């Protein structure tokens, strides 16, 4: 991933942020997804100081509420000063371990600090280890997990966010993601505001956060007067974390939009009754270049109408959605179509927040239909990366989206396809464009035409 910033960038000003939707956000809900009030706060930090910058006020609030706090630190930040003439990585790691213990004590007197000791700058290769370390700490009712935003723009932060999203699958833990470096580079369109919440901090909580940040001396001040020992957190950056509130991205709020939609209307988009939708589904299925696929993935299945049409073409298909109501309706749709559900049947319905969460295994078919608009540009990039990481050598990707403006969302179909197509970098086998809809089929290099694959040529 190309870096969007350096730590010396001034970035977006606080004045600009003050004019953004940031100021009108709803309050954070400090409970698990079942509504049990906060009892255990688990804070994931990619590096020592992330916990203070992104969730220091939340940690102080947990102390006030009598909740336990566990800080899981993925790396010890030994690569923060790669050109330091005075502090080799081993010394920095030791110093930063001491700093985070002192900082955590400022925020919560009984905070437990767990150092995983994974390599700084290479966390993406160790996401499973982070997920495993978190998962064993998320079982208690009333657990909230705070973690770096998975689209923060720093490779370690993004990896930590993905690991956290994987860890909460199958638990009641609420995931609150905190931006850090995004405050430098992001514009309003880069932030998924529908999921954003704020935690207003009282003066004592702000003081505790300031004291904790001061403990990270290797980051807020120079290591020495020598070149290469300069401070990492410059005053302009620190100002983002001196606000009277902290900002989190709550996946449950974003999912709640679709949950309310599906709970209120049996078929929110008229999939069953509208000729436009029935014709588009027929085009979608007809565009698939093979008669049968081993294992398919449908990103955002809604009530399962397309799922039921795709299932006969797949030995198994994983269909995902963020909404439990949508998945319940999808189960009924699939059953009515005479297609069985996993584990005995071929349709595996899963509640996942893609692309932050992602199903295991390999797929030779991935269908992204009418969901790309709901992601930011960075989210589309991550979706493409996830697809490429799980697409078989003979894999096929189908994209299908409405081309007219999407009220309330930044993107419509054409820019969604342009972004995904560019990031995937796969040959386009089919491109069907109408005034209303764009449908494209992309394949791995070497996948032949239908005629070639079926022996006509």
Residue ranges, per PLM feature:
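A conserved mid-domain beta-alpha-beta active-site/ligand-binding segment of alpha/beta enzyme cores
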Residues: 188, 193-220
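Class I (Rossmann-like) S-adenosyl-L-methionine-dependent methyltransferase catalytic domain
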Residues: 252-291, 295-299, 303-314, 318-359, ...
